[in-house]
């Protein structure tokens, strides 16, 4: 049985950037058709993400941002991850992978599953982090990984771990973002994987006065709707975890619009999103101040 501790960040009001909200709106627009893997809408989403990567001056591996892969469902299917990186200045050979899945459920008949919270919000936060880190010379190198086919079984992150652009031994941490735009049924944002970093938890507790710690345990999950019971396998950090790479996962609780056509950008909660972005950025700032031994020493 896997046992994992997570912390809960309750609502704190901060301002949210216009670009963050605009990226969510664009990615969850009707033109994207729900971003189902293999669809024309997913291709539009990739084009949007690639253009944002380019506008931020992010470098690519092997001359392009796309990482294609095959996976088996009812039949063999193809997916496409979007990769970019920012070279670090102090530890350039040590990488932090920031991940967020861009795929969603597509459409059924006339009903579009827009996927604003799940997971345009996470991709927008990834882009926000990329923008902030592009303004400085970060200590670590950062890979920005927008994954495909997460909804079908974490296939994008599995493909990345199976065929990484850098050696897995050089990846010190995965920071995964999934559903951070709404408070959900419990009004909370969850952070899991942080039990490895008690100093980080102490700082977050000081910054967010209503932070709590909750134990989460359960058998390995096969169905994503069980995410609240098995945090180590809840999203794209799962394959990193299984590869022995430490992870931090920010994600919200399910809400009434989860996996429905009502998950629209108009229902994103700016105050909650701003709080989540503040917590994520605080975490990155803490990571930037740690030597590799602190992160490397947490490998399983």
PLM segments and residue spans:
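Extracytoplasmic/secreted proteins, especially bacterial periplasmic and envelope-associated proteins
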Residues: 19-26, 40-55, 64, 121-128, ...
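Second-shell loop/turn segments in exported
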Residues: 30-40, 70-72, 110-119, 146-147, ...
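Acidic/His- and Gly-rich active-site-bordering loop/insert found
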Residues: 27, 53, 70-109
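Metal-dependent peptidase/peptidase-like ectodomains
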Residues: 137, 147-249, 295
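His/Asp/Glu-rich mid-to-C-terminal helical/loop segments that flank catalytic regions of hydrolases
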Residues: 131, 255-300
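Alpha-helical metal-binding/catalytic segments enriched in His/Glu/Asp
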Residues: 84, 98-152, 280
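N-terminal signal peptide c-region/cleavage motif recognized by signal peptidases
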Residues: 13-15
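A non-catalytic alpha/beta surface segment that caps or lines the substrate-entry region
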Residues: 35-86
């Amino acid at each position: 049985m896997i046992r994992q501790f997570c912390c809960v960040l309750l609502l704190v009001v901060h301002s949210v950037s216009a670009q963050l909200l605009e990226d969510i709106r664009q990615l969850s627009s009707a033109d994207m058709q729900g971003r189902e893997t293999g669809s024309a809408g997913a291709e539009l989403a990739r084009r949007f993400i690639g253009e944002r990567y380019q506008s931020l001056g992010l470098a690519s591996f092997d001359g392009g941002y796309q990482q294609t892969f095959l996976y088996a469902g009812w039949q063999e299917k193809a997916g496409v991850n979007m990769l970019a990186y920012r070279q670090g200045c102090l530890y350039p050979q040590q990488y932090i992978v920031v991940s967020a899945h861009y795929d969603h459920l597509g459409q059924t008949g006339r009903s579009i599953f827009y996927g604003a919270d799940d997971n345009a919000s996470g991709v927008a936060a990834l882009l926000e982090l990329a923008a902030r880190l592009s303004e400085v010379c970060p200590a670590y190198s950062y890979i920005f990984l927008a994954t495909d086919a997460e909804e079908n079984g974490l296939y994008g992150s599995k493909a990345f771990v199976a065929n990484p652009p850098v050696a897995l031994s050089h990846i010190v941490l995965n920071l995964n973002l999934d559903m951070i735009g709404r408070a959900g049924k419990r009004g909370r944002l969850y952070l899991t994987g942080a039990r490895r970093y008690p100093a980080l938890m102490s700082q977050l507790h000081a910054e967010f006065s209503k932070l709590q710690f909750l134990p989460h345990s359960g058998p390995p999950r096969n169905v994503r709707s069980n995410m609240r019971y098995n945090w180590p396998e809840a999203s794209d950090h799962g394959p990193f975890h299984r590869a022995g790479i430490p992870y931090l996962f920010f994600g919200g609780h399910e809400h009434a619009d989860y996996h429905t056509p009502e998950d629209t950008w108009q229902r994103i909660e700016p105050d909650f999103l701003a709080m989540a972005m503040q917590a994520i950025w605080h975490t990155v700032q803490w990571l930037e101040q740690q030597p590799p031994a602190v992160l490397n020493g947490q490998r399983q």
